[in-house]
Amino acid sequence: MQIVEQMKDKALAELNLVKDKKTLDDIRVKYLGKKGELTEMMKLIATLPNDEKPKLGQAVNIAKQALQEAINLKLANFEEQELNEKLAQEKIDITLSGVGQNQGSLHPVTKTLNRIEAFFKQNGFAIEFGPEIESDYYNFETLNIPSHHPARAMHDTFYIDETHVLRTHTSGVQIRTMEKQQPPIRIIAPGRVYRCDSDITHTPMFHQVEGLLVDKDVSFADLKGLLHVFLNSFFEKDLKVRFRPSYFPFTEPSAEADIECVMCDGKGCRVCKHTGWLEVLGCGMVHPKVLKAGNIDSEKYQGFAFGMGVERLSMLRYGIDDLRMFFENDLRFLKQF
């Protein structure tokens, strides 16, 4: 039994000096393998007297158990050390700046359109839509635009055929609405429109919002009040607004609304051509002929209409000086919004 105890102490001492898993396994085989030293001790039991056999068997088993536990503990330490080394190599430095993610956003024209629609919906206006390929009848005739009017010229309008055009405004939606609805009518008609023009302030396709209100006892004062409130709301400031007499075949009287230049606060700059004013929309009282074309009794009802370019308002709101930037898909430009 003393030999077994010495063998155990020797094995444990060797374990304390082990530095790697291979050496650890060699010690395991040396003492606990099929031909290991402690295993061979079990073979001596057969040569002992009967009263000595249990003592030796018990001593060998205790030694083997102690050695196996020590080996298991050492092995666990090695595996933990390997895991820590691996984690250290694969460690992610969370203090570093992350990789930026591309984040989408709405196009500035869409933002402007949503802002316009939100205001008029809050003021009781419905949103109506119509075809972009419009008939000559709805695009011109019903709007009091005679055949000799310049707007019908080939250089101003995209003709599909002799009787159909790419709509030059969304006014046709107003006629279609009056045909199917009776007053009171409150609508806006947003959408794409097309004209033969392309430069720093014009594109062949652009977005427009037109509005129509038809009811009893409607006056130009109602129109002015609505548009004044809208412009102050859109630009989020108390603006000076003026209405200048103008001419549109579908309204009488007609006017154009100017606002105090939002770039220079009316002091005069390149954008407002040093006048201190910016033209933003056209408006007027609906011409009796247009009401008649929409099956509305002009003796009983009056109406006003207005129209504005969405890109124009976007340019003023966001300080953009070239209309073409809206359509170039330049991410450097679009990411600013």
Curated annotation (Swiss-Prot):
Q: What does the record give as EC number?
A: 6.1.1.20
Annotated transmembrane regions:
none
Its subcellular locations are:
Cytoplasm
Q: Which cofactor does it need?
A: Mg(2+)
Gene Ontology molecular function: any one: tRNA binding
An example GO biological process term is: phenylalanyl-tRNA aminoacylation
What's the name of the protein? Phenylalanine--tRNA ligase alpha subunit
- Point out the gene that encodes the protein: pheS
